[in-house]
């Protein structure tokens, strides 16, 4: 087997409780390849930075770096600059990698000479430190695919949810560094997806593995979706960056499906904002209209995007000024949603 080296970049921010498990899941891999683990402490205040130094002293494969807090994208970009491996991987500090992963990746690269590996994920839901359930996210296909095939059926790959994360992938370092592909700092939503799309622009062969090697930790006690979608202006700026990447890539691939996926994302997140935001729809009328009148979104539609009928209807109703009617409908949806949550909590207490 051809010798290869991985650089595994781990942004670290206040995850001291989980970091050892994350690092050990890599160090205990039984693989005939070399790797370096780059721990990039992003200004932690819980002792994670000191733990990074300790882990580095214990094992020569672990390198510790410290920087001023700038977010996960900034920490990953820092890791890219410091990396020396032929292949790059990104793992979050509270997640883990299954045994056999690196060995499988090495065999796949050796046999296929692909530009990127995409593998499955396990979403592990924790409540008070215990896994309550797992949601397996496996690629529906197994084997190598040309880039043109992926963009010809882009919606299918997006709905599999295998393209949107940077964590369930192996990248060629040369493609990233030679083309200056980086995570957009300040982008807090779909920054991984944006990075992957920019990488795909310079790739040809992608290998899919249906095994869920990546374990993504989700603490159900700290999941607040409404916080991520409540600021409409920030939501718009993030999604416009993603749509711009899609527009650039569609010029190469002629993928109308990708543009339609982008349009659906744009309107669906407006839908979530209207549902979860505590601010009344009437009070943010101007922000909603500005969101709908985005020049980037308009270009997506002009280039052939076909949004889902439900999202298309929402966009149409806002454009025609039906703000008050929408406010009543979303108020009813929120009441129903909150009622279901209360019933669920009561049932859980009874079962205990």
Region spans (language model):
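A conserved acidic beta->alpha catalytic loop
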Residues: 25, 41-51
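Donor-binding/catalytic cores of nucleotide-activated saccharide
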Residues: 93-209, 214-233, 249
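Catalytic core of nucleotide-sugar-dependent glycosyltransferases
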Residues: 211-220, 225-254, 268-272, 278-299
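Glycine-rich, basic loop-to-helix element that forms the pyrophosphate-binding segment
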Residues: 67-83
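Short beta-strand/loop segment that forms part of the nucleotide-sugar
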Residues: 34-43, 63-68, 92-93
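Short, well-formed alpha-helical segments that are part of the catalytic scaffolds
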Residues: 14-28
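Membrane-interface aromatic/basic loop that binds lipid-linked glycans or pyrophosphate carriers
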Residues: 276-352
């Amino acid at each position: 087997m051809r010798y290869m080296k991985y650089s595994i970049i781990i942004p670290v921010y206040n995850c001291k409780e989980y970091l050892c498990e994350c690092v050990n899941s890599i160090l205990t891999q039984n693989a005939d390849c070399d790797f370096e683990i780059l721990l990039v402490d992003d200004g932690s205040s819980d002792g994670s930075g000191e733990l990074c130094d300790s882990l580095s002293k214990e094992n020569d494969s672990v390198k510790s770096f410290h920087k001023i807090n700038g977010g996960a994208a900034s920490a990953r970009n820092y890791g890219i600059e410091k990396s020396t491996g032929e292949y790059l991987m990104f793992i979050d500090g509270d997640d883990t990698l299954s045994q056999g992963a690196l060995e499988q990746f090495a065999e796949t690269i050796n046999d296929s000479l692909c530009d990127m590996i995409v593998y499955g994920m396990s979403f592990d839901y924790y409540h008070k430190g215990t896994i309550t359930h797992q949601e397996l996210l496996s690629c529906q296909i197994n084997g190598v695919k040309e880039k043109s095939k992926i963009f010809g059926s882009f919606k299918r790959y997006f709905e599999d949810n295998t393209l949107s994360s940077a964590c369930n992938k192996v990248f060629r370092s040369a493609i990233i560094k030679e083309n200056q592909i980086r995570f957009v700092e300040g982008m807090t939503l779909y920054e991984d997806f944006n990075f992957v799309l920019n990488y795909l622009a310079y790739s040809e062969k992608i290998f899919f593995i249906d095994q869920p090697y990546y374990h993504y930790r989700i603490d159900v006690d700290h999941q607040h979706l409404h916080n991520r979608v409540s600021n409409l202006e920030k939501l718009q700026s993030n999604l416009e960056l993603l749509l711009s990447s899609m527009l650039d890539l569609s010029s190469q691939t002629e993928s109308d499906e990708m543009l339609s996926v982008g349009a659906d994302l744009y309107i669906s997140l407006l839908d979530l904002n209207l549902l979860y935001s505590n601010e009344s729809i009437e009070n943010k009328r101007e922000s909603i209209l500005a969101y709908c009148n985005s020049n980037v979104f308009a270009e997506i539609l002009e280039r052939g995007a076909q949004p889902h009928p439900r999202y298309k209807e929402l966009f149409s109703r806002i454009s025609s000024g039906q703000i008050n009617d929408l406010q009543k409908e979303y108020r009813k949806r929120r009441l129903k949603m909150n009622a279901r949550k209360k019933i669920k909590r009561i049932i859980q207490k009874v079962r205990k």
